[in-house]
């Protein structure tokens, strides 16, 4: 007799994922292809402090801005209840710094008063700066950006020398339905030639406007960096593509800063800005496709630890309101539909999550090693569970289907 399982929508259920190479997967879905990615790096922020094996709670170069008297302070970073909180506040504290941070040239240039290695600060901000560097992959962050003029959260990659950078997301608290994407690299590589105008170039990047507010909401900001291009997404919708590559491996960063008058991303805070304030991060994940040489070298499980179904942090549908054609040049980008994630929980449940706007025709099949389809389910919800308890332990093929396109991988129950 064929066993059947229902796809269960769940309430606020806490589960534990076994996020190994075989049991946790993400698929990039387009109208004519399904591409499989495997877990490579992650943090679900389940502990009581930032994981020091994965992150620095300061910038490698110190994090003190002498001009603005702003410092990314470790005490502004904390983890609780499955959330990384990156804080920001004003201050008048005299903060003590080690000699290596106190750059004498910067002190002189900005006329900074130093007393016994102490500097009086105006602002405290925060950062989570990965110790590991990455080159290529799918980078994903589920986060809630704060509202309020001058607040400046970001999710980005930074390569140091020669100062290469990919900004998957930068926001301002006063631009409630907008997000900024950008790249930085030497030799004016971000200036692209305009079609039909061979002698005209335009600086890639800029502000994108959405039909829904992004601040104070849970949003998935992500991007795929592959040879020759970087594709940017918001809640699974492609919002931009940079055609070009970067030489260096990069550190992954989430941070909250404060803009100042006359500086980048001005204006600064005003009397209505609520401080202290924070940028909340639910998770940060890096995925690699099967052909990636870094994934081939990994050969170890990636632990996703505790996680819930995220129904207590639902993703509202967003849509790019104003498309910038020079940032969406390839016609095939219209085929991008979003992402489907599968994860095994500790109590033999398979969680399915959809991140995209046009994926009503996604079907999941579970096939035993004899080729028998033991379960087939049309995915109709953003999050759901498939109960695996009725099945014998062993290997199964997990197949994802969209129209005539199919991809699959082996999972272990």
List each language-model region with its residue ranges.
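Bacterial Sec-dependent N-terminal signal peptides
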Residues: 1-22
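Residue-level detector of functionally pivotal "anchor" positions at catalytic/ligand-binding pockets or at interdomain
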Residues: 293-347
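Detector for intrinsically disordered, low-structure N-terminal pre-sequences
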Residues: 12-15, 310, 372-373, 405
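C-terminal outer-membrane/trafficking sorting elements
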Residues: 325-413
């Amino acid at each position: 007799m064929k066993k059947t399982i229902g796809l269960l929508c769940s309430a606020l259920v806490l589960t534990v994922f076994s996020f190994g190479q075989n049991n946790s997967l993400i698929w990039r879905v387009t109208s004519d292809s399904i591409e499989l990615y495997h877990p490579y790096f992650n943090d679900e922020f389940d502990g009581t402090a930032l994981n020091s094996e994965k992150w620095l709670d300061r910038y490698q170069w110190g994090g003190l801005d002498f001009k603005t008297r702003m410092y990314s302070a470790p005490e502004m970073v904390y983890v609780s209840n499955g959330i990384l909180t990156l804080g920001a506040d004003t201050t008048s504290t005299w903060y003590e710094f080690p000699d290596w941070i106190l750059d004498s040239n910067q002190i002189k240039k900005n006329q900074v008063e130093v007393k016994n290695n102490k500097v009086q600060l105006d602002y405290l901000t925060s950062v989570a700066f990965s110790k590991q560097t990455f080159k290529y992959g799918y980078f994903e962050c589920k986060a809630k950006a704060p509202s309020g003029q001058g607040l400046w959260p970001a999710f980005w990659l930074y390569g140091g020398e020669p100062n290469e950078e990919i900004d998957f997301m930068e926001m301002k608290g006063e631009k409630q339905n907008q997000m900024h994407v950008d790249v930085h690299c030497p030799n004016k590589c971000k200036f692209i030639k305009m079609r039909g105008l061979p002698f005209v170039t335009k600086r890639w990047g800029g502000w994108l406007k959405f039909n829904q507010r992004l601040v104070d909401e849970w949003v998935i900001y992500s991007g795929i960096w592959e040879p020759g291009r970087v594709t940017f997404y918001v809640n699974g919708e492609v919002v931009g593509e940079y055609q070009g590559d970067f030489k260096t491996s990069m550190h992954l960063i989430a941070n909250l800063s404060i803009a100042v008058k006359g500086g980048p991303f001005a204006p600064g805070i005003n009397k209505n800005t609520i401080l202290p304030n924070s940028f909340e991060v639910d998770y940060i994940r890096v995925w690699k496709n099967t052909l990636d040489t870094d994934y081939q070298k990994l050969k170890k499980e990636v632990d996703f630890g505790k996680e819930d179904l995220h129904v207590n942090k639902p993703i509202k549908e967003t849509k790019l309101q104003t498309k910038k054609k020079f940032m969406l040049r390839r016609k095939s980008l219209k085929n991008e539909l979003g992402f489907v994630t599968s994860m095994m929980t500790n109590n033999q449940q398979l969680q399915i999550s959809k991140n995209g706007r046009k994926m009503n025709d996604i079907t999941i099949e579970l096939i035993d090693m004899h080729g028998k389809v033991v379960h087939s389910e049309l995915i109709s919800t953003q999050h759901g569970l498939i109960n695996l308890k009725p099945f014998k332990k062993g290997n199964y093929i997990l197949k994802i289907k969209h129209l005539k396109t199919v991809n699959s991988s082996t999972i272990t129950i």
